[in-house]
Amino acid sequence: MKQRFSKRTRLVSALLTLAMVCTFLPFSAFAATGDVEINNTNFPDAKFQEYLKTATRPGTSEQIDKNGDGILSAEERNQVYILDVEKSGIKDLTGIKLFPKLSTLKCSELGLEKLDLSENKELYTLYCSKNNLIQLELSQNTELTYLDCSGNKLTQLNLPVGTKLEKLICYDNQLSALDVNSLSGLTNLSCGKNPLGTLDVSNLASLKSLACYENDLTTLNVKNNSILKDLSCGGNQLTELDLSHNPNLTDLYCSDNQLSQLDLRQNKKLTTLECFQNKLELLDVSQSTKLQTIKCADNQLTSLDVTKNTALNELDCARNQLVELDTRNNVALKKLNCESNRLAGINLDDNVYLSDISVGSNTYPAEMKSDRTVDLSKLPNRFDVERASFWYGGKVEGNTLTVNEGVTQVRYQYSYKNYLTEYFYLDVSG
């Protein structure tokens, strides 16, 4: 009897102790399964509290706090699938973990410095761009398919192994390294404006769009990315770029690098090519007949054949060394910049849609004979002496230019399209 009483006493004592502990536990201790009070303990940010008290769930007229009692029940919290707090003034999203069913979070432009979403394991889409984030915790978010964390101060980005991520936008941060090897389902990667020295995308067979511009890359291997359509790698230090395994490429932006050659023979679907500010001496675009835009200014090109690019509507080949440019077949051309080359003249009469034209500052190195004459009939690019007038520095009779003594450069006006004229120059300095 004594032993039975002793067991009962111990059981009652244990139950009383448990009751006392539960009595003094705060609401937050039951956050995972029970009610959560909208207070400073659970949600330190006052504006976040106000949002939770007054905001409605997207797509409904119901408030998040349905009965307005300042307490979120488990049912109320579990019905929060989308939170859009962009530009709301909230500075701290502590308490976000209390919404376990959250699938979409939009929290851009808030000034957030830290964001821990490790307990929001059903998160599918995350927009947290243009904050001041130095820490982003996503180690448990394996369901994440879309992440935009651009415009922050992140020095590292640790993504969960096995994540379903399809689109990763992390440009304009401070990332010196980025490991995307495990993201086999990634289709879009935008990581420009970071100090990345290397980038390995060899495992990303599903990649369709890659933007890695304005980094510190010296090499870029895209041989395994056969379905790649859009590549933006400008503003790096690339000396070569092999695109022979990218037949689906439609848009290429590789300007401001150190490329001395660019082989586009396998890129027959290209519609946009921007390769300005490189060291290109040759550029063969004859196989890329679908090109609509070519920007190849500030290179070292001595020739450019665009006769097969009949869909072309914009051409910028300024500041090269071109002596010829035939645009007769480019009937759709609307914009042309060929200034600062070596053209003696140009005829654009066939380009009836051309309205934005820059042809100035062209100087052709002409051969002057010992008698100070230049045979104008030998000038390239279909030079027509009848289109030239107002010669300064010499006199023209027929196709012969006689250069004045002491003159090293002759100037003249040239009618390049109907009644439009521009000054061209002949360098006769020898």
Predicted regions and their residues:
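N-terminal capping/linker segments that flank leucine-rich repeat
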Residues: K2-L16, M20-T104, K121, T142, ...
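Leucine-rich repeat
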Residues: R77-Q79, L98-L102, E119-Y124, N132, ...
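Conserved hydrophobic beta-strand positions in leucine-rich repeat
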Residues: L83, L105-C107, Y124-C128, T145-C149, ...
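Consensus "Asn ladder" position of solenoid repeat domains
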Residues: S88, L110, N131, N152, ...
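Canonical leucine-rich repeat
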Residues: L93-I96, L115-L117, L136, L157, ...
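Non-core capping and flanking segments associated with repeat-based/extracellular domains
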Residues: L138, L147, V180, L210, ...
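Long, contiguous interaction/targeting segments characteristic
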Residues: S202, R265, E274-F276, V285-S286, ...
